[in-house]
Amino acid sequence: MVEEIMKSEEQKLIDVNKHRGVRSDGEEDEQLEEGEIVGGDADTLSSSSSSRPGTAIAQHPLEHSWTFWFDTPSAKSKQVAWGSSMRPIYTFSSVEEFWSLYNNIHRPSKLAQGADFYCFKNKIEPKWEDPVCANGGKWTMTFTKAKSDTCWLYTLLAMIGEQFDHGDDICGAVVNVRARQEKIALWTKNAANESAQLSIGKQWKEFIDYNDTIGFIFHEDAKTLDRSAKNKYTV
């Protein structure tokens, strides 16, 4: 299913991407800041495809709207409280909107060290304090430096394509770029539902062909124990 979505939508967006500064090989014509979208602000992206004759694309709506968030390392160094530097980039509601955004945003391997890039269901903030996330937890995968790009894409496609049996329990995903490694975490909202969490963890590994053992940590444990928090579930 992931491969089908990629193949069916890639051709539809060629014309849109051409006038947004993306070449056919997927590279941007100009160097961007981390998380920056080609063409300026969100209003430009949302209106540009409809402003030119002949570039209209039939929309394929997603079951949920999703929002990309970005936390830049330079802003985090000045923040007063955790999460205060986190900002939403754009909300998308269709397959076409997703691809036009994805093709204009840096991959994890191109982000600065210390950057965090999120994709969460609309109206859910990627914070422990968010009411939807408060009783949840996260599965985490670890990758060597600059090796998470494909797995990040496949994680996004599995989420927005509703490929998980317990998709309603998923809040979103985040990729953390650090000095020696990158991590992708899948956030869920009901950590105590063991069967649902195990199902999500197993399916996630299958979707992106990840062979190492992964662990699930409750947000509550992470808040109180920090780095000492232990995995409650593993798959």
From Swiss-Prot:
Chain positions recorded as mRNA binding sites: 78-83, 110, 128-129, 178-183, 223-227
Designated name of the protein: Eukaryotic translation initiation factor 4E-1
Positions of region (Disordered): 16-56
Family: Belongs to the eukaryotic initiation factor 4E family.
Disulfide-bonded cysteines: C133-C171
Residue spans of biased composition, Basic and acidic residues class: 16-25
Pfam families per record: IF4E (PF01652)
Molecular function as annotated in GO: RNA binding; translation initiation factor activity
Biased composition (Acidic residues): 26-36
Organism (species): Lactuca sativa
Misc note: Displayed sequence is from cv. Salinas, cv. Fiona, cv. Girelle, cv. Jessy, cv. Vanguard, cv. Mariska, cv. Trocadero and cv. 87-20M, allele Ls-eIF4E(0), and is associated with susceptibility to lettuce mosaic virus (LMV).
Chief localization: nucleus
Location in the cell: Nucleus; Cytoplasm
Function: Component of the protein complex eIF4F, which is involved in the recognition of the mRNA cap, ATP-dependent unwinding of 5'-terminal secondary structure and recruitment of mRNA to the ribosome. Recognizes and binds the 7-methylguanosine-containing mRNA cap during an early step in the initiation of protein synthesis and facilitates ribosome binding by inducing the unwinding of the mRNAs secondary structures. Key component of recessive resistance to potyviruses. (Microbial infection) Susceptibility host factor required for viral infection by recruiting viral RNAs to the host ribosomal complex via an interaction with viral genome-linked protein (VPg).
Gene (UniProt): eIF4E
GO CC annotation: cytoplasm; nucleus
Keywords carried by this UniProt record: Cytoplasm, Disulfide bond, Host-virus interaction, Initiation factor, Nucleus, Plant defense, Protein biosynthesis, RNA-binding, Translation regulation
InterPro entries noted in UniProt: TIF_eIF4e-like, TIF_eIF_4E, TIF_eIF_4E_CS
EIF4G-binding as annotated region, ranges: 60-63, 70-106, 154-163
Keyword Glycoprotein in record: no
GO biological process entries: defense response to virus; regulation of translation; translational initiation
Quaternary structure annotation from Swiss-Prot or TrEMBL: EIF4F is a multi-subunit complex, the composition of which varies with external and internal environmental conditions. It is composed of at least EIF4A, EIF4E and EIF4G. EIF4E is also known to interact with other partners. In higher plants two isoforms of EIF4F have been identified, named isoform EIF4F and isoform EIF(iso)4F. Isoform EIF4F has subunits p220 and p26, whereas isoform EIF(iso)4F has subunits p82 and p28.
Presence of keyword DNA damage: no
Modification after translation: According to the redox status, the Cys-133-Cys-171 disulfide bridge may have a role in regulating protein function by affecting its ability to bind capped mRNA.
